Amino acid sequence: MLIKKLIVFIEKWGLVLLVLCLLTVFGFTVEEGMKPQADAEAISVWTSILDTLTSDSEKAEGWAKVMHLLFNVTLAWAGVRVYMSTAGFKWDNFAARYLARSHVIIIAGKSEENSPSNTGRQFSNSAGLEVDKSALAIELALSMATSRPVVLNLKSVDESNRTKLWEAGVTLLTEDMAMAAVLAATGAQRASMLIAMRDHYGDNIALTRSAFSHSMDNTELECKCLIEPLSVKRTFRLEDYFENDSLPRIRIFNEAELIARRIMQNHPPDLPVARSNEAGVHLVLVGLGSVGQSILLQLARLGHYRSGKQPKVTVIDRNVKQQWREMLGAYPQLVSLVQVETQELKIEEITEEDVDRWLFDERPVTMAYVCTKDEIANLRFARLLVNRLQARDPKSDLIMPQVVALDPPGGCVLSDYSVNGLHNGCFHVFSLVPSDLQKQETSKNAGNHLISEMDDARARQFHEGYCAKDRVECEQQPGRQPAPFNRPWTELPETARNANRMTADHFEVKMRAVDYCIIPKQALADSLVLLPDQLELLARMEHDRWWADRILDGWTHNAVRDNKRKFHPNLVPYEELTEPIKQLDRDSVLQMIEILDNEGLAIARTC
């Protein structure tokens, strides 16, 4: 670390220091040459400068000799810089392979060594399935390096990013190596976490399997495996590629889904109407690419609120009709869960009249997400919407929605507008890894945000509680068979694990519906309990959420349950459920409060 910092300092300031020293010594040499000699008169400053510039290094004395030395060193600087870069990478190679302990490994970029043509692996539509995540990997490494050691393997890193990474303490490897070689070079045998995010999902699967091989002998290693694009992630089954004993240590992720999950947690669309029995959610969604589709799907799963009304979504994109048809092809049940209105427009074509029409809809806008890949386009629409909001009558009782714009990796315009723009706090910028400007506004560690989104702690506690309750019922009813999903977390299909994750994600929605919030337990004088009518309301919301999650996963109603054919008898309105089944929903709500208590948290009335 010290050697790396020294190399970075010399590389960054070496030339400046050499030039300053050279100019200083040159001045001393000129001054020395102007002094009168015993057998000659004093010379002018210009004559002394000329003599200094044309002096012979072999005959130089005093300051002139020092000047020639510094001049030669400065000329050699280009070669020294090349050497320093080589030495720096060699030191990083040594440090990662032999010295790193309990570190995070991030492997990203495109691998020529492991391309399908070189390995014999063949992927259909290979070019279309490659998604560059280099920028995200660099920003993630910079963010995570503030709290833990990080080793980044990325083949191509420009000079400015390389300097940033070194200054942050990130160990950087740029060689393109075979799977086993890159894991050995990054010290995977002693690492605590591997984040495999190469451009092709096949490489990430191979890296994760190699990391769990017996030769690595690291039973504590956790792996986060990127599966892109979204079309592949939708049908991906973890159990098709990994053995059951490996599943607990693997979490697949997709950047668009992580963004959707986090953006709806940080800026929930129901916030202005959460406690209303009448008002419904109206989301304006600009961009129906991978992020927009993930947000829409997340809303369909979690958008079950106190009012019982379907969320309304106004979707704006230049090719929105075709994109919406493709979504319905993958999820035909969406039409029964969200009310979608499509507006086929380019962002540049949106006018103030369009914005006013959405704002003054019979169901007023409660939130706007702007999530195209073009930050300039995002900025235009965000400012247009903010300006129309500010132009409204301040005495109006209409909802004041928030505007959230997605900031792509490497972006800076939206961050600047968020911090310095005139938006009266109704504009927010979102990124998985905030920019420097955003970090000035928050004390949270950005790198941990992404990792925490892949943490299954609460979901596993939900499942363990479900299994414990089912075991008790089996003991009380001799001959009763355990429920189909009453088995260890490691043996659950990914869809069942996702169902538990959704249960955890929906809890804050439920708390807002009864005007509660989650706070540290020590900040609460007396513990609160849910009133019977509150518990019943939240149980209904939980059932609606579960119902939506099941039908989006392909389940249909049938009087007899069949897991293989995805039949379930409880896919009916809450009022039609039997009392024991309703109690399961109530228990789910109460279990979340127990989980919060275990984490040192409690529910309290919203201030």
Residue ranges and their predicted role:
Residues L2-T24, V30-L69, V73-Q481, F485-R540:
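Cytosolic regulatory regions of ion transport systems
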Residues V80-T86, F567-C607:
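In a subset of proteins, long, contiguous C-terminal domains/tails are tracked
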Residues E473-E475, R480, C517-I519, L524, ...:
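Short leucine-rich amphipathic alpha-helices used at interfaces
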Residues E508-M511, R550, I593-L596:
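A structural signal for well-ordered alpha-helices, especially hydrophobic packing surfaces
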Residues D526-E579, L584:
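Amphipathic protein-protein interaction modules
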